[in-house]
Amino acid sequence: MDRRIFGLENEYGVTCTFRGQRRLSPDEVARYLFRRVVSWGRSSNVFLRNGARLYLDVGSHPEYATPECDNVVELVTHDKAGERILEGLLVDAEKRLREEGIAGDIYLFKNNTDSAGNSYGCHENYLVGRHGEFGRLADVLIPFLVTRQIVCGAGKVLQTPRGAVYCVSQRAEHIWEGVSSATTRSRPIINTRDEPHADAERFRRLHVIVGDSNMSETTMLLKVGATDLVLRMIEAGTVMRDLSLENPIRAIREVSHDMTGRRRVRLANGREASSLEIQQEYLSKARDFVDRRGGDEISHRVLELWERTLNAVETGNLDLVAREIDWVTKYQLIERYRKKYDLPLSSPRVAQLDLAYHDVHRRRGLFYLLQKRGAVERVASDLKIFEAKSVPPQTTRARLRGEFIRKAQEKRRDFTVDWVHLKLNDQAQRTVLCKDPFRSVDERVDKLIAGM
């Protein structure tokens, strides 16, 4: 697929610290956060003018699903716009708390685990053709996804019975099977529930739920960009070495616990390979593929960063990607802090630092303090991110949804939308079904808007 639809869903962790007598449960905090959303959307599950979906997921986790994007830079921009929208809700909720005499700070974390060991996710969505063999897609992808964390994990200090260890991935400890149709009870690597949110005869949505939520724009670009290249190779029939893993779930944990990328995991054919070797195999195939087929600026940037990250892991010279890869940026931050205060990795102060990296409040979050200092690389500009808070992507179906919502709100019309339906709740109950996510112009939608 030369042009692909991408989407990211990020669940956020919520917590509140109180200085007064009155304390709020996570549910109550989430209600404060979403009060403004409910006041204009009459629900805690809404679609926004930029085409995105914002809702309260199970366990009081706010979730932001980007609109459909057809290039990775735009996807990163819209994911960051989601952070800004949630930061706005947070500031608003804190103000409301103060007005009601409750002394407390609300924190929103874009991470994947809380202190109680619960996990919540970052789900990646890739549109693929219906005609391909989904089983083969999964077979080729799983070894890539299991080892991909070495280049795009978010990093985490994990407390184990043998002491604290630094892992490259947050999500790895919480994945229990390779391919499954459940997302919460048993967390698989690829979710197979068949909901294409598009014409089911033509398309299928590949739902990858193994990845970490990224603060770094460049890590996010690499995560989705490299996965897209691997998908394109599979779709083009590129012959790949069989790297199927004997036990993907054991392998994912082993890879996560090894910052050197050298620990060997067992393949289904009895041989062994390290995460570095497996990633290098996919990278060299992807490089050949782009050389043969030609690639755009984004794919060249992805390949360059992918290679440099593997080089950094292999040589142990993490400075090579300290400005671009989440787990490395965070690791170096923690190590500097530990040296300065002579702390063990198991120190509660280190755990606090680990968490503060993911705080989306720009005046408080450690990632944003690094960004303000110019210590991390960017993909999107602040202006583009600000625009993306209210303007949908212009080349996908999101444009139709965003325009419809904007007009209906301006005209104060009652409406219902989801990923494929646009409906005016008037006597005629006029509905337009948008089954092609690539289509950004549709006379039926224009007519629906004109008739408001």
Swiss-Prot record:
Residues forming the catalytic site: 57 (proton acceptor)
Residues that bind Mg(2+): 9, 55, 63
Keyword Ribonucleoprotein attached: no
EC id: 6.3.1.19
UniProt KW keywords: ATP-binding, Ligase, Magnesium, Metal-binding, Nucleotide-binding, Ubl conjugation pathway
Chain sites annotated for binding ATP: 53, 66, 419
Catalytic reaction list: ATP + [prokaryotic ubiquitin-like protein]-L-glutamate + [protein]-L-lysine = ADP + phosphate + N(6)-([prokaryotic ubiquitin-like protein]-gamma-L-glutamyl)-[protein]-L-lysine
Listed InterPro entries: Pup_ligase, Pup_ligase/deamidase
MF GO annotations: ATP binding; ligase activity, forming carbon-nitrogen bonds; magnesium ion binding; ubiquitin-like protein transferase activity
Pathway(s) per entry: Protein degradation; proteasomal Pup-dependent pathway; Protein modification; protein pupylation
GO biological processes: modification-dependent protein catabolic process; proteasomal protein catabolic process; protein pupylation
Record's function text: Catalyzes the covalent attachment of the prokaryotic ubiquitin-like protein modifier Pup to the proteasomal substrate proteins, thereby targeting them for proteasomal degradation. This tagging system is termed pupylation. The ligation reaction involves the side-chain carboxylate of the C-terminal glutamate of Pup and the side-chain amino group of a substrate lysine.
Note: The reaction mechanism probably proceeds via the activation of Pup by phosphorylation of its C-terminal glutamate, which is then subject to nucleophilic attack by the substrate lysine, resulting in an isopeptide bond and the release of phosphate as a good leaving group.
Listed NCBIfam families: pupylate_PafA (TIGR03686)
PANTHER family recorded: PUP DEAMIDASE/DEPUPYLASE, PUP--PROTEIN LIGASE
HAMAP family: Pup_ligase
Family membership noted in the UniProt record: Belongs to the Pup ligase/Pup deamidase family. Pup-conjugating enzyme subfamily.
Identification of the protein by name: Pup--protein ligase
Organism of provenance: Streptosporangium roseum (strain ATCC 12428 / DSM 43021 / JCM 3005 / KCTC 9067 / NCIMB 10171 / NRRL 2505 / NI 9100)
